């Protein structure tokens, strides 16, 4: 009989023969060959079992023991009790106030127990109150140890021991053990022994110390002392020197005559009590030398002994102010953030800007689309109930059963399969708007194995963003079509393919959003200004200093701009190095680059003459300045050249004619001088006025003299310019009369000067 084995082999089998098995050696745990290397690599030994992610052995099977499951309520209670006892806030202070009143009552009763009138009544109440205090403190101590397990560093028995070694926990256990020992050994029929009461008074002090569980008082004191350690050490050192010196000198002066200063220790006691301004009066100097020394060192030493109190007081005040300052500045955080957000929306919602879209997209998501434009009136109530849970996404209602979760169409597919999504994808073409997909087509696309879903890339996101948007005209068209009666409404009642998508914001809605953003910006700005109110005097000083620096910078900028317009640039600019005011390369008054400063224009400050400036070799080659100051400089140069020519002609005339100065002075006194032209320094205007007045006097005096003997020359029309003739030609034309010759010449000069001034 041939039998086929389980492993596929064929061998003759007998009833008494042992069945052979083909396999690996040492796979069974506990087998003799299971300690081989190959066996350990294939199956592993029995001891190290497969662990979880946290390297803990998995507990599988029915017989395996399950670890104790921590309840959520257990953890919550542990955290709650730990916060109440270690970090009290809010109503948790009620318990700590109760403990404080309990300890304070024990302290008051222990004080009354020392008075004979109230000794008996206070001892009984103190006994009961001490028992209550011990019970409360004992329960609180064990609850603290148990609740500390909520912190990871205090978990386990080692963590509990670490928590118990904290200073305040050590004080708690000391007070608890000592109180139990005093009550057990010192009580005799509800009456305390004297030694027990004394020990109990000491325990009251420790109980008051434990009231500050967080140690904030001691931390504050330590920080103040550390911050002002140098000042304190200096004051204590000088005060100690004054104490030693004053005690020693008074001891030498009072040693033989005063019994209170028999030893140097008595003198040190007197010096300490005196310099600390306590003055018990048990010891005092009696000799005049001792009194004089005591008065001198008292005036010096008291000031140094009082310094530490002032240093610590100011240090505490500054530390408290530093602790309150961050709290005051934290109040400015929310107004500042709101101001930044509202300022950006105020900037981004500007209708003239077309490059900012994120803010408008935010409002497109938040603003509700009117439902009555998209929903037929017959299905409005039912769809409104269904659309409450749909926040602006595509919604379809089909008369087919709801598909399973695995067959549900994704948001992306629903958007692109919708007619408006296809319209957005087809860029508004009429062919794309008329295309509609049936649910069967969508299902066939989803079920086809050849279609592999692609990742939703940024391009898809942009396409879905376009698909989510629908123009207001399309929405109004849908509302009009929905309002028309006919067969379409009946078909929509049977199968409503309604879609809910967001629409673009209309211009009116954008204007409304813009107005709201402006109002929010103004309100946020006002709130932020209110939060910037000064906290203390230091804030006021800082604000004034910042404003002063800002004002100085603005004034400096304004001055530099004025100098750039009407004068040379300030020394800090590189333009001043290019055109220096002194040296061989400085521009002269005739150069187009020259322009007077503001003080020179208004007539203040020393005038800069041509002697102070040296003409450069390249002045004539410089291009003309087209600015206002360049043109004014050019006009001034022309006027100066004309003044030089006129001065030359007048000097020749006066020398040739020999006009007496008495006549000119008499005429000058009878005629007021004309005012000086504007935009000139006082020296230039004075010189110009003198020259002009002199010319007028000479001209009018000569013309009046010539009119006595000769007639006036024929008038020349103003449009024509007189011919340029020399002085000899005019002398030969008018004969031998010198006055007439000079009068005609000066008249021509006067007319030519008037025409040039008109030009």
UniProtKB/Swiss-Prot annotation:
Topological relation to the membrane, as annotated: Multi-pass membrane protein
Q: Where is the composition biased (Basic and acidic residues)?
A: 609-618
Q: Which InterPro entries match?
A: Ion_trans_dom (IPR005821), K_chnl_volt-dep_KCNQ (IPR003937), K_chnl_volt-dep_KCNQ2 (IPR003947), K_chnl_volt-dep_KCNQ_C (IPR013821)
Q: Which residues cross the membrane?
A: 91-113, 124-145, 164-183, 197-215, 228-253, 288-314
Task: Cite the record's tissue specificity text.
Answer: Exclusively expressed in the brain. Expressed in every neuron-containing regions of the central nervous system examined, such as the cerebellum, cerebral cortex, occipital pole, substantia nigra, amygdala, caudate nucleus, hippocampus and thalamus. Also detected in the cochlea. Expressed in dorsal root ganglion (DRG) neurons.
Coarse class of the primary localization is membrane
- Where are the residues of the annotated region Mediates interaction with SLC5A3? 222-323
Which chain residues lie in intramembrane regions?
264-276
Membrane topology, Extracellular segments: 114-123, 184-196, 254-263, 277-287
Where is the short sequence motif Selectivity filter located? 277-282
Show the segment(s) annotated as Disordered.
393-412, 419-459, 565-628, 705-742
Q: Which positions in this protein are listed as binding a 1,2-diacyl-sn-glycero-3-phospho-(1D-myo-inositol-4,5-bisphosphate)?
A: 214, 230, 327
Tell me the null mutant phenotype.
Answer: Mice lacking Kcnq2 present no overt phenotype, but die a few hours after birth of pulmonary atelectasis which is not due to the status of epileptic seizures.
* Modification after translation (UniProt): KCNQ2/KCNQ3 heteromeric current can be increased by intracellular cyclic AMP, an effect that depends on phosphorylation of Ser-52 in the N-terminal region. KCNQ2/KCNQ3 are ubiquitinated by NEDD4L. Ubiquitination leads to protein degradation. Degradation induced by NEDD4L is inhibited by USP36.
Q: What does this protein do?
A: Pore-forming subunit of the voltage-gated potassium (Kv) M-channel which is responsible for the M-current, a key controller of neuronal excitability. M-channel is composed of pore-forming subunits KCNQ2 and KCNQ3 assembled as heterotetramers. The native M-current has a slowly activating and deactivating potassium conductance which plays a critical role in determining the subthreshold electrical excitability of neurons as well as the responsiveness to synaptic inputs.
Q: Family, per the entry?
A: Belongs to the potassium channel family. KQT (TC 1.A.1.15) subfamily. Kv7.2/KCNQ2 sub-subfamily.
Comment text on domains: Each subunit contains six transmembrane segments (S1-S6) with S1-S4 forming one voltage sensing domain (VSD) and S5-S6 contributing to form one quarter of an interlocking pore-forming domain (PD). The S4-S5 linker preferentially interacts with PIP2 in the open-state KCNQ2 channel, whereas the S2-S3 loop interacts with PIP2 in the closed state.
In Swiss-Prot or TrEMBL terms, this protein is called Potassium voltage-gated channel subfamily KQT member 2
Organism of provenance? Mus musculus (Mouse)
